[in-house]
Amino acid sequence: MEKFMAEFGQGYVQTPFLSESNSVRYKISIAGSCPLSTAGPSYVKFQDNPVGSQTFSAGLHLRVFDPSTGALVDSKSYAFSTSNDTTSAAFVSFMNSLTNNRIVAILTSGKVNFPPEVVSWLRTAGTSAFPSDSILSRFDVSYAAFYTSSKRAIALEHVKLSNRKSTDDYQTILDVVFDSLEDVGATGFPRGTYESVEQFMSAVGGTNDEIARLPTSAAISKLSDYNLIPGDVLYLKAQLYADADLLALGTTNISIRFYNASNGYISSTQAEFTGQAGSWELKEDYVVVPENAVGFTIYAQRTAQAGQGGMRNLSFSEVSRNGGISKPAEFGVNGIRVNYICESASPPDIMVLPTQASSKTGKVFGQEFREV
């Protein structure tokens, strides 16, 4: 059967999907609904074709996929009451018993009640969009999400609220494209682990080289306070600054350091400012939480007692895998692998698809690409 893959126009390439996770093999599409929605009903599709029963009664529905083949392996439907009962307990038990290699599509259809233990499970799974109890009591919810059992976490979600009076498009459409389970959540999970938009500057000259210690001022912060455990992968990002006087003798340094239960140092990952004096330079890296780690700190400092250094816009979030690129750029039926997008381009080419050996595999230019 014919399927649109890409359109080449004057100065642009149009594809169905620009895959930030560098994946194009499988695509699951879902949509949730609620009463008074003017859009279509709930659905579940694989490779843009309906998969499994498309008849959804009022309630919360689960579709379980094997990510290695894309096969639908299980289906569940739950019509909850407003309070905890055997149905809500069955939902929690089923979700907690899943093997660690499943993708679960979660979607609503029609009027859905959400008893406390179901809401509690969603909170534990890392939802950031699901409404509070006070909103649930006044609005109907259209909800769609993808849950990855390997991380026991919601990887993507979409929610809309109906005031129970007005008709509107309440359909919550959500797509995920992946090659393997590790691709789901590769750009981060809804629960942002930590973010600071503050700007921190060191003293000018003097002997105090500290710029900032985060996420708290304590020498060691608990990993558990940020839902992190050994083996988790973090995407760490910050902007660093150094003036000319500092660069004449040193630079600005940032490190994330890990500690064991006895507060003993285990390991660290560091980055240094290498840009032009007086400018801000973005630094980003993937960091694996080491074995036996229970605490950590992020520390920014000058490496010389001269001039001024700075740090701003620090954030770190859990992702499903590190950022190593193991697959060459390519077109697939679900779009194009793209690892990162530049805002502008200087080459005359419509696009560049480097080889797997290239350090810039998957690089495309944002001004030349658009999604359908």
UniProtKB/Swiss-Prot annotation:
GO terms for molecular function: carbohydrate binding. It is found in: Virion. Structural component of the distal-half of the long-tail fiber. The long-tail fiber of T4 is about 1600 Angstroms long with a kink in the middle that divides the fiber into proximal and distal halves. The latter hinge is probably composed of gp35 protein. Residues 22-193 form the GG-type lectin domain. InterPro entries: ILEI/PANDER_dom. This is Long-tail fiber protein gp35. The keyword Ion transport does not apply. GO terms for cellular component: virus tail, fiber. The keyword tRNA processing does not apply. Keywords: Host-virus interaction, Late protein, Lectin, Viral attachment to host adhesion receptor, Viral attachment to host cell, Viral tail fiber protein, Viral tail protein, Virion, Virus entry into host cell. The long-tail fibers are trimeric, with a stoichiometry of gp34/gp37/gp36/gp35 of 3:3:3:1. GO terms for biological process: adhesion receptor-mediated virion attachment to host cell; symbiont entry into host cell.
